[in-house]
Amino acid sequence: GLPPTTEQLLTNASYEDTVDQLLASPHYGERWGRHWMDVWRYSDWYGLGGMLRHSQKHLWHWRDWIINSLNKDKGYDRMIQEMLAGDELDPQSREAVTGTGYLARSYYVFNRNTWLDATIEHSAKAFLGITMNCAKCHDHKYDPISQVDYYNYRSFFEPHHLRLDALPGETSFDKNGLPRA
């Protein structure tokens, strides 16, 4: 999270205790969550007037999920599972379902294909460390991903649809909702 303060360095606490104290701080998740949010392309809501365009209102729930997951020492593999399939892993768990904000974050109201293409592009870069953009249209001479591979990968995301659920106790999504896949 944050580097130790001068006071923390001057105490008689051991190095290990100071590190444990810093890792237990909620600032740890805030600091490192910021880096993961860059990788996973987190962006707050924006639209035109009241109309949703490229992201989701209340996507801050997903941002907080990232921070809390890091602070709880949730494994990276579990975080990825919840981001891609939290609604299937544990549909009754709000925490697991909130992870699917990853899929909702790049929602594009005008064209589902644009949303799917962006999700494929972001997922391949973030989780596989490769680009798949060229393979959408053709096999590339030097890339290991063929056009068939691209559409096989896309088939994983095809069943996903966006849901905009009001949270328990709220009367509408606009007041406080949970964007999810």
Residue ranges with predicted function:
Residues 2-181:
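Short, structured secondary-structure elements
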